[in-house]
Amino acid sequence: MTTPVSPTSLLPLSAEQLTRLQAATGDFSSTQLAWLSGYFWGLIQQPGNVQPGATIDAATTASAVTVPVQTITLISASQTGNARRVAEQLRDDLLAAKLPVNLVNAGDYKFKQIGQEKLLLIVASTQGEGEPAEEAVALHKFLLSKKAPELKDTAFAVFGLGDTSYEFFSKAGKDFDGRLAELGAERLLDRVDADVDYQALAAQWRRQLVDILQARVPVQGNAVAQLAAQGALDEITSSPYSKSSPLQATFAVNQKVTGRGSEKDVRHIEIDLGDSGLRYQPGDALGVWFDNDPALVQELLELLWLKGDESVSVDGKALPLSQALKSHFELTQNTAPIVEKYAALSRNETLLSLLADKPALQQFAQRTPLVDMVRQAPVELTAEQLLGLLRPLTPRLYSIASSQAEAESEVHITVGVVRYEYEGRARAGGASSYLADRLSEDDEIRVFIEHNDNFRLPANSETPVIMIGPGTGIAPFRAFMQQRDADGAEGKNWLFFGNPHFTEDFLYQVEWQRYVKEGLLTHIDLAWSRDQAHKIYVQDKLREKGAEVWRWIQDGAHLYVCGDANRMAKDVERALLDVIVEHGGMDSEQADEFLSDLRLERRYQRDVY
């Protein structure tokens, strides 16, 4: 006769511990339970977390450490955080469905293992004029090269994020999707290309994908939690403040840092975070929610014969039309889809003629403010028709120009105010003019931190640093230097900065001169493009100092570039390649490979926009 064994006697918990655990997790969802299991697994992997004398029975842990054969690899290729959020939501959906998934940033993905992937999901954003997210550049380059392997045993799906105000909308997503298919991979689901209002499309895509994968992949048990551990550990330090739940901070300082004669209006902005506990690191960005200019709202309403007091529904809430336009919809960015929809409503011949010529349509949208398009082709619309044209308001991201080692409960940003004229009428950027013109000291401002682990100072404070940041691209390097100063970092620092004029546009001049005097800033090279007959830019200074730049690289220097993605960043990269060819003794192909290796080693990082 065999005596039955109580199930609880097999557990490494006492009855009291089991009761407490059940009470604590009784109201947890399946996703939360999976997250918690992964969190605990991650804890025991950390050195020192197994108590002396404690034993772990192999029989009780075997299932937790067995990696399933068909693991879903989910790659997040994010520039501003949106792709990362979609990927995290998909991961949570898959975990809730008990499907094994490994979420990895594109910058951390060992892309040469792609030939072994069975199930591959990519959420990819596009930056600038069709470029992949900075963290995905190496993966994108590898996949589109001759080195990419056949993927006949791989099934995949791609979700692309972009902005229809740019010509090459969602190009990175299209590139990944098309190339994976070319390499023989099976498409699980048609690619989705989402605009800035991506949430509904993303939710639908996630639901469809989970259904497809549930029919294809065996449901797993504890292995899911083990695979989720990496993501779980990342989330325990997350802030309660986010894009959807921003901090109500205090607007503290608005100081113009360009001279009276400058063609540019650049502001140093300081925001008081109070006792919120909101934390950030050098390299992070500040997300800023803003309101449109009431004068612009009124101008648009009058052109469309609307009063502004019409009741409309926004996210299920009734609002006056004027308030909805002020706080919930983009008014300072025109796009080709908006022009197309407005042409259909207005039946304006000039606008309709653009529809057959995509380049002309895109150019018109980029050059013509929305309100001026309406002025050129006025038509009487209902409030609902107007809102149906517009995109939801999105926050703007600014590279943080301070370190909390110095600024403590403040966050600083450097804002180039967008101002221009269109047919004799003054126009301005939505967020930049909000910060420069419409906020007063002590006003509330809604902000959040967008973390950027792809733009970080070296872990070793003795490592040399080369910083290349013309214009407002200097912002994160102010944060870098504050941090290096506070850390007593012994590594050398070299700044390349450029702007039109020395006397009018030398941003934070006194601070840089102090760092030079104190010896913290080893070198500073300045390029003033309009102070002489021939224009000089930072890329020219890089070539001029190429021999020493190469010596620094050979000594392990980390390279950082911040600023304009469309021209400056490309020109700087060409200059760096020229330096590597000339002083490194390589041909162009070898130089390109060398720079790619620096990127993979996190020694070449860019924050471009």
Swiss-Prot record:
Q: What is the lineage of its organism?
A: Bacteria, Pseudomonadati, Pseudomonadota, Gammaproteobacteria, Enterobacterales
What does it do? Component of the sulfite reductase complex that catalyzes the 6-electron reduction of sulfite to sulfide. This is one of several activities required for the biosynthesis of L-cysteine from sulfate. The flavoprotein component catalyzes the electron flow from NADPH -> FAD -> FMN to the hemoprotein component.
Pfam families, per the entry = FAD_binding_1, Flavodoxin_1, NAD_binding_1
Q: Which reaction does it catalyse?
A: hydrogen sulfide + 3 NADP(+) + 3 H2O = sulfite + 3 NADPH + 4 H(+)
Q: Which UniProt keywords apply?
A: Amino-acid biosynthesis, Cysteine biosynthesis, Electron transport, FAD, Flavoprotein, FMN, NADP, Oxidoreductase, Transport
Which family is this sequence assigned to? Belongs to the NADPH-dependent sulphite reductase flavoprotein subunit CysJ family. In the N-terminal section; belongs to the flavodoxin family.
The cofactor remark states: Binds 1 FAD per subunit.
The residues covered by the Flavodoxin-like domain are: 72-210
Q: Which NCBIfam families match?
A: cysJ, PRK10953.1
- The positions annotated for binding NADP(+) are S529, R530, K535, I536, Y537, V538, Q539, D571
What Gene3D superfamilies does the annotation carry?
Answer: 3.40.50.360, NADPH-cytochrome p450 Reductase, Chain A, domain 3, Nucleotide-binding domain of ferredoxin-NADP reductase (FNR) module, Translation factors
Q: In which pathway does it act?
A: Sulfur metabolism; hydrogen sulfide biosynthesis; hydrogen sulfide from sulfite (NADPH route): step 1/1
For this UniProt entry, what's an example GO CC term? Answer: cytosol
Binding residue positions for FMN: S78, Q79, T80, G81, N82, A83, S125, T126, Q127, G128
Task: List, separated by semicolons, the cofactors it needs.
Answer: FAD; FMN
Where, by residue number, does FAD bind?
Answer: 332, 366, 396-399, 414-416, 420, 429-432, 609
The keyword Amino-acid biosynthesis appears for this protein: yes
| Name by which UniProt lists this protein | Sulfite reductase [NADPH] flavoprotein alpha-component
FAD-binding FR-type domain spans which residues? 244-458
Which organism encodes this protein? Pectobacterium atrosepticum (strain SCRI 1043 / ATCC BAA-672)
Entry EC number(s): 1.8.1.2
Per the UniProt entry, what are the Gene Ontology biological process annotations, in alphabetical order? Answer: cysteine biosynthetic process; hydrogen sulfide biosynthetic process; sulfate assimilation
| Residue ranges the record marks as coiled coil | none
Q: Give any GO molecular function from the UniProt entry.
A: flavin adenine dinucleotide binding
Write down the InterPro entries for this protein, in alphabetical order. Answer: CysJ, CysJ-like_FAD-binding, CysJ_Proteobact, FAD-bd_FR_type, Flavdoxin-like, Flavodoxin/NO_synth, Flavoprot_Pyr_Nucl_cyt_Rdtase, Flavoprotein-like_sf
Q: How does it assemble?
A: Alpha(8)-beta(8). The alpha component is a flavoprotein, the beta component is a hemoprotein.
Broad class of enzyme this protein falls into: oxidoreductase
